[in-house]
A protein has these predicted regions:
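Conserved class I S-adenosyl-L-methionine
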Residues: 34-43, 60
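Class I SAM-dependent methyltransferase SAM/SAH-binding core
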Residues: 45-97
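A short acidic, Gly/Pro-enriched loop at the edge of an enzyme's catalytic core
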Residues: 98-111
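A short SAM/SAH-binding and catalytic strip from SAM-dependent methyltransferases
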Residues: 108-126
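A short glycine-rich, Lys/Arg-flanked "PGG" loop and its adjoining helix->strand segment in the class I
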Residues: 126-140
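Conserved beta-strand signature within the Rossmann-like core of class I S-adenosyl-L-methionine
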Residues: 140-149
Length: 368
């Protein structure tokens, strides 16, 4: 079982400061005054000040019993908050929320899952449970959103490493694959070297420079996430790499949040507010994801690209280390895309790559 808590990092960590910037930006963009927000895997609520500043009306914190939620509940009850709160102790990707949540008149306007989605894709059953719980939590018209490692970026970097390894030729063994990605800022290591790449449960360790230990994640297969979200009653809105999120929103947020990216000795942006290369590299490892629970009383939402159940037996996609790897890998469900929805999905894929967004230079050129 993977822990719901990442290792502690110093405040000046490049990764941590960039993620905090994006979390603050998402809250500023999506949370209206007096909104009801739900925070999945809230831990000891490190974002308490953000919720205070957002002037929310009600807070729902959910995490496993060992997360320290009970301590937060006691602390919040001992002081007067401007908003009400409730805390539920259970694992939302394993247990049914109906067994724990009795105050259902307080459905959420927004459900956040900040950096913990990879904990829920170890199996298809876990992801299904999470998404059905999210759908139960949300009001019609409400949003489910958060931040997760960008599988498109990570997988593309990994396959480029494998391609380069085999292009060396000569004494290289054909069935041996490098299992790590390295940069000056981080190292990504896959736990198992194998030719198969399952849709669920593909584990890897992400360790940033200066960290004592790495974080264990599972790659998120975005087509499966979109399909299962739709089954749970959630429509796809957007999946956007954080480099693009920063570029799209920096003009609006720079004045408000620039101080989060600059301090006396660890600037993450240049004088014009543009990300430095090391910041861009780290930020590009992550993506936002946004889904919406449709409201039948309002204009019908845009249809989520439909991936039919078909023969979804989730056979592992075979990895072939050659020039055509982009076309071969993670394509088992391509044949299940019906013609009437292919244009919508193609648009997403052309823009984002078949696993998610990723920086432009790492995107796949072949649309589904």
């Amino acid at each position: 079982m993977m822990s719901s808590f990442p290792p502690h990092r110093p405040a000046e960590s490049t990764h941590q400061r960039l993620i905090e910037f994006v979390k603050t930006a998402l809250i500023n963009i999506f949370v209206s005054p007096y909104a009801t927000v739900c925070d999945l895997y809230c831990g000891k609520v490190p974002d308490e000040e953000k919720w205070d500043e957002a002037q929310i009306g009600h807070y729902i914190g959910i995490d496993v019993t060992t997360s320290g939620v009970s301590e937060v509940r006691e602390a919040w009850e001992s002081r007067r908050k401007a908003y009400t709160s409730e805390f539920l102790e259970f694992d939302p990707c394993i247990e049914d929320i109906d067994m724990h949540w009795k105050n259902k008149e307080n459905q959420a306007d927004i459900v956040f899952c900040m950096q913990h989605l990879p904990l829920c894709v170890e199996t298809e059953e876990k992801l299904k449970r999470l998404l059905h719980n999210v759908s139960s939590l949300l009001k019609p018209g409400g949003y489910f959103l958060g931040i997760t490692p960008d599988s498109s970026t990570i997988w593309a970097k990994y396959q480029k490493n494998v391609e380069a390894y085999h292009n060396k030729g000569g004494g290289m063994k054909p069935n041996i694959f490098p299992n790590s990605i390295r940069s000056e800022s981080y190292m990504i290591t896959f736990e198992v070297e194998e030719e198969k790449f399952p849709f669920f449960g593909k584990k890897y360790q992400l360790k940033f420079a200066g960290d004592m230990s790495g974080e264990t994640h599972c790659l998120v297969h975005f087509p499966s996430l979109i399909r299962l979200a739709r089954e749970a009653g959630l429509d796809y809105v957007e999946i956007q790499n954080l480099t693009e999120f920063y570029d799209d929103n920096s003009w609006l947020l720079r004045a408000q949040l620039a101080g989060m990216l600059v301090d006396a000795g660890h600037n993450l942006v240049d004088q014009r507010g543009r990300l430095l290369q090391r910041s861009y590299d780290v930020l590009g490892l992550y993506t936002t994801f946004i889904f919406q629970k449709p409201d039948p009383d309002i204009t019908p939402p845009l249809m989520t690209p439909l991936l039919e159940d078909g023969s979804h037996n989730h056979d592992e996609a075979t990895f072939i280390p050659q020039r055509d790897w982009q076309v071969v890998s993670w394509r088992e469900d391509d044949k299940n895309v019906p013609p009437e929805s292919s244009s919508g999905l193609t648009k997403i894929i052309e823009q984002k790559g078949i696993l998610g967004p990723g920086p432009a230079e790492l995107r796949f050129s072949d649309a589904i």
